[in-house]
Structure formats: structure tokens, C-alpha cells
Amino acid sequence: MRVLKYFRAPSSLRHRSSPMAQFLRRFSSSPMANEDEFQSPVEPSQQQSQDCVSESYLIGFVIANIVGLKYYSGRINGREMVGLVREPLNVYDNNAIRVLNTRSEQVGHIERTVAAVLAPMIDSHTIVVEGIVPNTRSNSNRYRIPCQIHVFAKLEASSTVKSTISRGGLVLISESDTSFGLSEAVVVKEQMGNGDKRSVDKIFKLVDENVKLMGKLVAAEPPREVIKSELFAHQKEGLGWLLHREKSGELPPFWEEKDGEFLNTLTNYRSDKRPDPLRGGVFADDMGLGKTLTLLSLIAFDRYGNASTSTPTEEPLDGEGDKIEKKGKKRGRGKSSESVTRKKLKTDDVVGMNVSQKTTLIVCPPSVISAWITQLEEHTVPGILKVYMYHGGERTDDVNELMKYDIVLTTYGTLAVEESWEDSPVKKMEWLRIILDEAHTIKNANAQQSRVVCKLKASRRWAVTGTPIQNGSFDLYSLMAFLRFEPFSIKSYWQSLIQRPLGQGNKKGLSRLQVLMATISLRRTKEKSLIGLPPKTVETCYVELSPEERQLYDHMEGEAKGVVQNLINNGSLMRNYSTVLSIILRLRQLCDDMSLCPPELRSFTTSTSVEDVTDKPELLQKLVAALQDGEDFDCPICISPPTNIIITRCAHIFCRACILQTLQRSKPLCPLCRGSLTQSDLYNAPPPPPDSSNTDGEDAKSSTKSSKVSALLSLLMASRQENPNTKSVVFSQFRKMLLLLETPLKAAGFTILRLDGAMTVKKRTQVIGEFGNPELTGPVVLLASLKASGTGINLTAASRVYLFDPWWNPAVEEQAMDRIHRIGQKQEVKMIRMIARNSIEERVLELQQKKKNLANEAFKRRQKKDEREVNVEDVVALMSL
DNA sequence: ACCGCCGGGTGCC
DNA sequence: ACCGCCGGGTGCC
């Protein structure tokens, strides 16, 4: 019987999997022997649409044994997900289903009786399966372990699937018995409409934010011996990122180290073997930002390199030292025949570092080859980087020949042709690095090219593309497979961890994808990049308070310190968070102008007791009123100026509709601080004073100019003297301050425009248009609230920016500057921060710096969920207690 | 004995 | 695998 089966195998395959070959593979522990165990990203039979995944729902699960454990090195601990991969070319059973662990190591097979039922349905895309191993402790059999196979199918196919499974003699444990399954299916269906497309736009959101907020990008200079062109700032930052990704020894995303063990938090895989760091990633800058030059700069380091730059220094390169070292003879011949002097080579040899392979393989579409050549000629010192064209006509079949070059250029087509050529030198070579240019061409639809590049051997892998996602997030799967980013490089894991949750509108899918891309990819868009912009300078202008202001400020600060110290002493600081914020707010307002803080609010001790305001709604209302005419803010849910303002017990502010909807939909928690929150914790804000601008105007007239206002005025006048046509923007976070500024500036002869959160969208665009209008000449000042100037607003008509008060968050300040310093800006830009001396404002600056540093040194710790914008420690620093 | 039964060899697909 | 299954050895009580 067994003999018969053996002969049924296609003869073309027999040599690959002859019993002897199997025997060798089984009992050889050499890593090389596992090379052909590597899973290609696309099984030949599964190339078509992946859409079925998103419309599927869980029909139920069957229990099946994973068998053959003793023949494979992959281990599992139980309570973890496994990858199920069809193996149609298995000689013993074309229904075979392989079981892989998080590390892509094979654990075993699904027992054949079960595979026989499931495999045909998998192949016809009728079902999708996911495997979970419940627990191995109770059932510690060395030869087989049970596994839950979850079966997903389209709603309309479910009855067929169910009967096929039971006819095959399997027991389907179905949740629809409890009527839960079906209702879930309906929900899933409804959410389908806006599933993938909209999410895709968000995938890279975190990438941007991460880069911006964490300031992770550290510029690096390419070696001058190789690269003769000066890089743009964003290219230097890109280079710094590439270097960082290649050298960093940090754990890949979703891995944690826990008492010497390494845990994959998504699959629950545990092992004491450290997962390899991901040396490489997705370089996804927009087209036209100079990715090619940046990559050439990276390659230049292989030759003249080293980190005499500002790049972070990390662990030594190459964890695969042993493996490659064994092939010493190859390296010797390849490199010593090169006569070019290499300073770095020596150093490396002394340190004992592995330098065996310095060749980078670049794969690109044929049309792009000439671009690489042009860039090489244009930007590199002639004769330094040696390039071999492995494309077209005559190509060497000698690996050693290829090793002589720094760069081997080839095309996807060439590789595809060589797929079946065993002795292809490109396939035999162990590259230092592989760069897939225009990597989106290997997306899932192009199975052959995907397969080929995935099998290439290299310790650093880069996917380079300006359009990482064309047909949906599934495109990214091909890149993961190429990067060998475990476990996502196994389709089954990708599907269950990312694709299915995403398709079902499950937040986990998107957030996982965001985290994933944030750590392994870099994407800057053309719009945000700063190519060829005139320089910008940032200055700080310190303002001395007048004696009168000083006296009031010192008095208030003294009082504030007392109040806060009291709260700290009796441990109720955080319970009185709202009080503290309003105290700090008052102090900050005083630095701008005393009239921001009306006389009745000039004492903290009278109106604010030690008890929290939350127990006194009338005080809360006062706070609301103060906030409302004071700080400019957005509803964090809809990210626009709030309508029908609601303030919560925990002092967060939302639109009425937004927060009510949120509370209804999810748990009764505040979306910002996650404190418990019910409808009774919501307080209405009093209706906004409709003619506030009129009364404010009167106020301004009656009061004299504050020190800061005077300082601003003289700065503006000095700039006007220099160039009467300079347009300026003044940002303040206090709406009232912007109103106060109008009168004195008008009086000094400036044309005033105003942009604030209370304006309609239409009005705002009108103001911005007017400000940018070249016919509006003379000294023009735009008084703007930053939050009102949403993203994408263009204020490049201005060349001076005044930040009238400092923001907590340095990124917000940066955003403000970006409105002016962006593409289209023709003049040099000067930014001036206005800071009151010896005041809380100086400490806000320090806080800014601290936050920046924190982000720099520990960017991997993304902001903790409960971290407030300002914490206890910050309060202590701000109050200089 | 074209059976039953014994006990060794063996073990994924 | 302290199992099941296979197939050879064996054969009254």
C-alpha cells in the first residue's frame, strides 16, 4: 500500500523528497539543511483573491492531532497559535497540512484523516483555517498533540462546509448552537462595507506620528570617500534610520523578554532562544524624496564605514557570524583578490568581526536599472563602488565572481527565469543585503516573483517602495514574507493576526498593523518633506515682566505652590487634577497678560478649597468657563472644536454627542484617562457668551499693554522696518489673547487677520486665502490659534512666526512651524518663542525638552496607555516644588 | 491454518 | 507508544 503511494508522486519531484533526502533532512541539525524548509509566501494553488477571508465567519472548530512531532525541531508550549500551511506537493499525501510555530519552524502535520477532509476545502478557498494548541501540560504526549482547528467560511457556504466536515467523520464543535455565532456573522457582514479601504489610509498614521513625536530619526552623514553629493536633511535622517535598523539588536515588535524567556505577545509562543532582530524593513518614502541616493549612502558604509556619524551605536553586526565564518575559503578568495584598499576591513579583522560578505543585491524592474546607474554616476566618487549588471545577455555563473562587487543589480524577471536553475549564482550567494526596489511589484498576485525573492539568502533585507499598499493591506503580507518577519511571514499567521481582524472591523487588526509598520517602516510623504526649503531659525525671546506684573505673578505663584504642596502632602494631587490644571493655566495666562485673568480669579485659596471641584458642580462650571474663553482645544473624539461642550468629572472635555455616543457604544470609561465615567459624571458647559469679542475689546482698551505684548510689538516693528511687506503669524493657545492683541497691533498700523476655533470652516479658508493673497501687501499679522489651523493649512505667505506662549507638547509647536515652513516657502523663516523670564513658562520649556529626550532615548516604549500629558512629576517641576 | 493467537517491530505526512 | 497496527511465526491439551 505504502509503496503504491510512493509511486504516485510526480516523478519530477522525487529527487527532492526521496526517502534518503528526507532521512538526511530529518537527522541533520545544520541550519543549512533547513533552507528548503523555508516557506514560500504563496502556495501555488492559492494565488487568487483573498477577499474571502474578510467575509468569513467562524463556523466552529474541529480537534485534530498534530502528528510527527519527533521528526521536526519546532516546539510549542501550548496555549498558543500555530500556522497551518497546505503542502500539496507532499509525496506521501497531497492533502498534507504542515503545522508551524511562531518561528516558522515546522512542528508536525495535521493527521491525515482530518487533512483529507479540510485540504480540498482550503484549496478551493471555501474555508480558511487557523490553529490553536490549547494546552500541552495535561496531554504531554511526545508524539502527537491535539490542536483546535478553527474553520472560517462565507455565510452562504456554511451549511455545505458543515455537512462536508461531518460526512468526513469529523466532529465540528459549533458555536452557532448557542445562537451566538450567527448573530456575530450578521454583524461582521454589516461592517464589511467600510472595512479595508478606509483602514489602509490609517496604517501609516502611526509611522508618521512615531517619527514626529518620538523624534526617532537621527541624521547620519554618508562617508565622503564614496558619496560626493550633499544629502538633504530628510535623506540624512532616512540614512540614520536605515543604519539604525541594520545595527539594532532590539527585539522585533510583539516580542517581550521575561525572566530569560522570550514571549511573542500575539501568538503566545515562548522560548529561551532570542528571536533574531529584524535587520531591515520597509523603506516607503514617497517617490521623489531620493530613496535611491539614501540607499547608496547606506551601501557606502559597507566600504568606508563606520559610525563616526551621529548614528546610535549598538550591538555588533551580524548574528550569523558562525555560519558564514565556516565558508571562509570562499570569502578569502573573493575578497583578497580585490586590490582596493579598505581601511575598515583591517579594523574588522582585528576585532574579529565578520566581513566575509560585502555585496548588496539590488532587485528592481528593468525600467529602474538606468535610474540606479544615473544616481551612481551622479552621486558617488567614480570607481569606488563596483557594480555588476546581472541582467540580460551574458551573466556569470560564478558566485565568487559576484562577490567581487559592491553591488549586483538584477531584475525580478531575471530571477524568475532562474527560479528553476539550481546553480544560479544569485540563489547560491549569501548576500550581505538585499534591496527590493519598487517592492510592491512582488505583491501577492505575482506569485513567482514573490517566491523567488523570498528564498534569496541575506542577513539584511529591505523592501523599498513608494506605494506600499496598492490593493489593500494584503499587499504588505508579501513584504513580510520577503523580510522573513516571523510569524507574519507565514500567511496563516498573517491572516489570523492581521487580515481577518482588519476585515471584520476589529480594532486589534488595525492597531497591530500600525504598531508593526511603525517599527519596521519609514514613510515620509512628499508634502511633509522639506526638500529645498529655505532655512528656518528658531529663537527664544525672553521677556521681563513689569514690576506690577511681577508682583501679581509672584503672589499667585506663591499661593499656587501652597495649594499644590498641600494636595501633594495629603496625597490627593491626581484626584484634584482638574484643579491643578486650572491653577497652572492661570499662571500661564498671567505670563501673557494680566487681563486674561480677571480680578475675581486672582486668588486660588479663596475659591478653590482642597476638595476636588468634582464635588462642586458650580466650581466645575467656573472651570469650564475659564477653559472655554481660555485655552483652545478640540474634542478628542471628533478632533474638531467641540459643540455643546461637556466636561467630565475627570476634567476632560468633549462634544456632547461624541461622549454620549462613546459611552453608549463601549464601556463606561473616559476615553482619555480611562477612569470610570457614567452620564452622571458629565457636566454641561454654560452657553458661550455670544458677544464675547465685544466685551473683550473693551477690556483690552481699558488695560495697558502687557510686557509681552509690548515685546511682540517691538519685534514686529523691527521686522517691519527691515521689510515692510513681511507677513507674520502669531500663535497663542488662548483665544482671548488673540483678541487682546488686535487693538494694539491695529493701532501700530498692522493689518490684522484672525483665525480661531470658533470660526466656521468656510470663514477659516476665507481668512487663509486672504492672508496668502499676494495683493494684500504691507505689514500683515495673522493672529492664529493653532488648533484651529488644522493639518494641511498653508501659511507659507508668512516668513515670521511668533509663538506667544509655549505648548506642553513640543510636537504641537513643531506642527505650528510646519504650517509656515513647508513646500512653497520661498523666504527664510524665523520663528520666535516668547517666554516670560523667571516664570512657569521657562519650566514649560524644560518640560518640553525633557519630553523630547525621553522620546529619543526610549522610543521603543511607546506612550503608555494611562500616561497623562502632564503627570505628578511634571507638576512638581512646573511649580518648582 | 484460505483460520486465531502470540509477540516483536514499529510509529507523520 | 504503558498504545494500535502490521505481518511473520505458529498451531491440542
Curated annotation (Swiss-Prot):
Short sequence motif DEAH box: positions: 437-440
GO cellular component assignments: nucleus
Statement: the UniProt record of this protein carries the keyword Zinc: yes
E.C. numbers: 3.6.4.-
Segments forming RING-type zinc fingers: 635-674
UniProt domain Helicase C-terminal: residue ranges: 711-876
Record SUPFAM superfamilies: P-loop containing nucleoside triphosphate hydrolases, RING/U-box
Binding site for ATP: 285-292
Chain segments carrying region Disordered: 308-343, 681-703
SMART domains according to UniProt: DEXDc (SM00487), HELICc (SM00490), HIRAN (SM00910), RING (SM00184)
GO BP, sorted A to Z: chromatin organization
Entry's Gene Ontology molecular function annotations: ATP binding; helicase activity; hydrolase activity, acting on acid anhydrides, in phosphorus-containing anhydrides; nucleic acid binding; zinc ion binding
Location of the protein in the cell: Nucleus
Residues annotated as domain Helicase ATP-binding: 272-486
InterPro entries xref list: Helicase_ATP-bd, Helicase_C-like, HIRAN, P-loop_NTPase, SNF2-like_sf, SNF2/RAD54-like_C, SNF2_N, SNF2_RAD54_helicase_TF
Function: Possesses intrinsic ATP-dependent nucleosome-remodeling activity. This activity may be required for transcriptional activation or repression of specific target promoters.
Family indicated by similarity: Belongs to the SNF2/RAD54 helicase family. RAD16 subfamily.
PANTHER family referenced in this protein's UniProt entry, alphabetically: HELICASE-LIKE TRANSCRIPTION FACTOR, TRANSCRIPTION TERMINATION FACTOR 2-RELATED
Protein name: Putative SWI/SNF-related matrix-associated actin-dependent regulator of chromatin subfamily A member 3-like 1
UniProt source species: Arabidopsis thaliana
Lineage: Eukaryota, Viridiplantae, Streptophyta, Embryophyta, Tracheophyta
